[in-house]
Curated annotation (Swiss-Prot):
One function term, GO molecular function aspect: GTP binding
Site feature Not methylated, where: C203
Lipidation (S-geranylgeranyl cysteine): C202, C203
Function: The small GTPases Rab are key regulators of intracellular membrane trafficking, from the formation of transport vesicles to their fusion with membranes. Rabs cycle between an inactive GDP-bound form and an active GTP-bound form that is able to recruit to membranes different set of downstream effectors directly responsible for vesicle formation, movement, tethering and fusion. Ypt1 regulates the trafficking of secretory vesicles from the endoplasmic reticulum (ER) to the Golgi.
UniProt-recorded name of the protein: GTP-binding protein ypt1
Modified residues (Phosphothreonine): T164
Highest taxon of source: Eukaryota
Gene designation: ypt1
Gene3D superfamilies: P-loop containing nucleotide triphosphate hydrolases
């Protein structure tokens, strides 16, 4: 048994490029924010450990590239994931419309019963918002998926999003501590790299 944690969960952040996945990860893992973040090529991950309902949970959070042409790279990373957060940009209708495609990717590559969470990011950009909360909530409810609007810029609901996902995975796993020890999710540190490609608004 590992004395450092009771649970080790692998989470994925997926969604179109530019919706703010990397910024959500930076805000949750490091409590930092930058207006212009280098777009992720391939996969990168961060780790954060915290207490949840009297247990120590270690999250390994993978930030997958959103561009269509990199989906073949990230498909292998769906395997072994305990939870997947689908992110769209509340100021970008197309990114919300594409959520259905990302859900199909989950059905195709992830394990059956994997926990899912829908997140509408950049909620601080009220004047530019085009995807209404009620529309996204109705969509999420129809699929029985939890839904939150977040802002990596002002921290709104970022912590709540990851805690919600962690709590759901913990409930699904029951009292099986070290739940992920049997999952085929081992990956080598350093496989994911960041390459300077383009800057994107990170909200």
């Amino acid at each position: 048994m590992n004395p450092e944690y009771d649970y080790l969960f692998k989470l994925l952040l997926i969604g179109d490029s530019g919706v703010g996945k990397s910024c959500l990860l930076l805000r949750f893992a490091d409590d930092t924010y930058t207006e212009s973040y280098i777009s992720t090529i391939g996969v990168d991950f961060k780790i954060r450990t915290f207490e949840l309902e009297g247990k120590t949970v270690k999250l390994q959070i993978w930030d997958t590239a959103g561009q269509e042409r990199f989906r073949t790279i990230t498909s292998s990373y769906y395997r072994g994931a305990h939870g997947i957060i689908i992110v769209y940009d509340v100021t970008d209708q197309d990114s919300f419309n594409n959520v259905k495609q990302w859900l199909q990717e989950i059905d195709r590559y992830a394990v059956e019963g994997v926990n899912r969470l829908l997140v509408g990011n950049k909620s601080d950009m009220v004047d530019k918002k085009v995807v209404e909360y009620s529309v996204a909530k109705e969509f999420a409810d129809s699929l029985n998926i939890p839904f939150l609007e977040t802002s990596a810029k002002d921290s709104t609901n970022v912590e709540q999003a990851f805690l919600t996902m962690s709590r759901q995975i913990k409930e699904r796993m029951g009292n099986n501590t070290f739940a992920s020890s049997n999952a085929k999710s081992s990956v080598k540190v350093g496989q994911g790299t960041n390459v300077s490609q383009s800057s994107s608004n990170c909200c």
